[in-house]
């Protein structure tokens, strides 16, 4: 993934056109930004309040606890994927073209994947594991269905979906956790095209 950041997952500006009032969504998005930067363990009320330029009272207006905020942040991330990723592909009728569009979309949206990588490090957290399980299963189911529609048998579609997902998670590990050198843009684009040509039928 390169350095293109999706505008739907950017930090809210405190006191932007609403005085000093922030919504619950603003707090949830700020928590996601902090997860992307420092991990789940960094989510806390005081640093988020400082980041947003408000008092802790604004937080407690919307959430009873830090755990409630974390749950809202995870739900926001999950809903974003359902609507902005899978939802954006509903109008692509050809299954192979839909898979190609999915691979390109996933390759060029950075922040959701950084968040996912950080969540994988926190699977022992009781709020994180159920979300990761749902998201991972939904992704695999979508891939299996798409590969089936593209002409593969059920068994081959399952194998291809797992291979595609393993390539995705493995790339995250190499890029974000093992901190391999960042690829030049042309090299990255060539890699994405190679993955597409290797995994997508026809």
Describe the residue ranges of each PLM region:
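Helix-turn-helix
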Residues: 26, 30-72
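Solvent-exposed, amphipathic alpha-helical segments
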Residues: 26, 30-38, 84-88, 118, ...
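Hydrophobic alpha-helical connector segments
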Residues: 72, 83-116, 164
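Short, solvent-exposed amphipathic helices
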Residues: 131-138, 142
